């Protein structure tokens, strides 16, 4: 059986996901058989596994850092928010139910079993498991039946490293305060701390570092400077999306929907020197110089269509098309482009039918069956083959489907308008393929100059080197039990 170490944070967005990816790559470079694990994640940015399940995309990146294909055991519980107060519950890759936030607490006691089953399977396969917590163990109001932080660490007997974020300020209180509010037993599970996101000269924090050690009795494992290349890796949270400031070239605008999903579809495009990528947020007007507008995936398609209209983006899109611009809809965004979206069974919310944007002559009916698959598709226009994945509910039909975007196992996918300005597809991840991305950009007279997979590989290596330069990586890995 393998050993394990768990990285928990003093709060959300302290950099846990990135640090786990970096530690995974550092362990792999040491010749260690390593895998990532996150008991519970909350994200609409999901990845498809080879066996038809879905997990958080952060765990897929961590698996990539280990040189592994992602499996459902790496993230056995995935919560996908559908509304402000409810989420879809994915257990070991498959949809279990949808629950309101208050009801999830009642469900949690039944989920520790599957979590431990997945964890133990990984331990039997690999020498080292690097576990990522969620949120913070200082949220002691959630400690009862916890499966994400100390509840899991206690059940699985995994030692913990606590990470604080100095960039947001108050990191001494973050770390010392965490020890103050958790139980002595939980505090005993924590074997040290790490400070992340320091800007400037880390030596300026020497005194603060010693204060934390003296107050907690925990050893420190380093002060990590801000990792400037983090934007080159897929973001887990939509609000963490960073695009390089770039003027000129092909201007692609992505609508930042309220329940945006699989937004990392845009990452490979944003890396291209010949592309200016803009994430359009609530209250902003679609730029008149936009060449292509992307409607991304959504966890609540009808709800996000209402959100889109509330921003006036439906009017902006119509004007954009009149100017000769192009529109690409991905998954939920594809469904929005049609004449109507019917949800008779209330799969994504209250039952009913919503009028679509009407830019494609198609209609969509939501169905209970969810399709999750990693596939190889054939581009209808060029015949080029490319890898992609699907995560969606719904069936789409209509006259414009006679002009498909691609073929999957010989079956048509997507639709293209008669004037070829509007395209929709259920496929995700297609732009990660360098050859296909080059071909797609060429139709807009843009030369592809970046290798996305190579960029991610290089950045993960740089991240591991960054950790090795500023943290006691060998000491951290030696904590594993």
Swiss-Prot record:
Keyword set, alphabetical order: Cobalamin biosynthesis, Glutamine amidotransferase
Quote the catalytic residue positions. 331, 428
Ranges where the GATase cobBQ-type domain occurs: 249-436
**PROSITE patterns noted in UniProt:** GATASE_COBBQ (PS51274)
Superkingdom of source: Bacteria
Which SUPFAM superfamilies does this one have?
Class I glutamine amidotransferase-like, P-loop containing nucleoside triphosphate hydrolases
Q: Which cysteines are joined by disulfide bonds?
A: none
Which pathway does the UniProt entry assign to this protein?
Cofactor biosynthesis; adenosylcobalamin biosynthesis
Please name the GO terms of the biological process aspect recorded for this protein, alphabetically.
Answer: cobalamin biosynthetic process
Kindly list the GO molecular function terms attached to this UniProt entry: ABC-type vitamin B12 transporter activity; catalytic activity
- UniProt cross-references to PANTHER family, sorted A to Z: COBYRIC ACID SYNTHASE, DETHIOBIOTIN SYNTHETASE
Family membership = Belongs to the CobB/CobQ family. CobQ subfamily.
Q: What does this protein do?
A: Catalyzes amidations at positions B, D, E, and G on adenosylcobyrinic A,C-diamide. NH(2) groups are provided by glutamine, and one molecule of ATP is hydrogenolyzed for each amidation.
State what protein this is by name: Cobyric acid synthase
- Organism from which the protein derives: Roseobacter denitrificans (strain ATCC 33942 / OCh 114) (Erythrobacter sp. (strain OCh 114))
